[in-house]
From Swiss-Prot:
Family per record: Belongs to the bacterial ribosomal protein bS21 family.
Species: Cupriavidus metallidurans (strain ATCC 43123 / DSM 2839 / NBRC 102507 / CH34) (Ralstonia metallidurans)
A GO BP entry: translation
Any Pfam family the entry gives: Ribosomal_S21
Keywords: Ribonucleoprotein, Ribosomal protein
InterPro entries: Ribosomal_bS21 (IPR001911), Ribosomal_bS21_sf (IPR038380)
Gene3D superfamilies in alphabetical order: Ribosomal protein S8
NCBIfam families: S21p
The keyword Ribosomal protein is assigned to this record: yes
Protein's name according to its UniProt entry: Small ribosomal subunit protein bS21A
GO MF terms held by the record: structural constituent of ribosome
Length: 70
């Protein structure tokens, strides 16, 4: 459970912003969105494979030198 303690004199808006940031860091919102509807195992595998390929492409893109240097 994520808890935020209000500091003395802290506006509620700032505390809400801190709470939202803390919730995003835990990954709770993403998990809740993924659990709202049933996802077939084949669809889940396809989604995970597509995400893994995107991560690989991103990693390769980061390792390449800029065009100006070679």
């Amino acid at each position: 459970m994520t808890k935020i303690v209000l500091k003395p004199g802290e506006p509620v808006e700032v505390a809400m912003r801190r709470f939202r940031r803390a919730i995003l860091q835990t990954g709770l919102i993403v998990e809740l969105k993924s659990r709202t509807a049933y996802e077939k195992p084949t669809t889940e595998r396809k989604r995970k494979k597509k995400a893994a390929e995107a991560r690989l492409r991103k990693r390769l893109r980061m390792q390449m030198l800029p065009k100006k240097l070679y």
